[in-house]
């Protein structure tokens, strides 16, 4: 497990730093890739709860891409799209048991994964945003590293 973490860090940190420094479409591309990977991992773990994958992935991409092109209003428009798509799903899609629970699992994935990457995009666009975004990346890496080693102790 530690080997895979080191490998991801050796490859991922330079890619993340490059995307943050270059900004623009580089950070958008990385955010989209990481959002799709994060959503896949989240929905794989919660497969027994049957989230709506189409609604979740579409809304997640709308949140990240909307944040890049339109700022905070774009992020909010993506979240609104999530709610609207979910209501259409509940009206015209599969009904069945636990629909509200399935919608909740779908919504939470978008909020947890996609909104996080959208905020990274928004943070990068602020004054001194590159430094702030690198600080957030460093804090996240340190937090994950310490949690891993403390959890193993």
Give the label of every model feature segment:
Residues 2-153:
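Membrane-embedded alpha-helical bundles of polytopic integral membrane proteins
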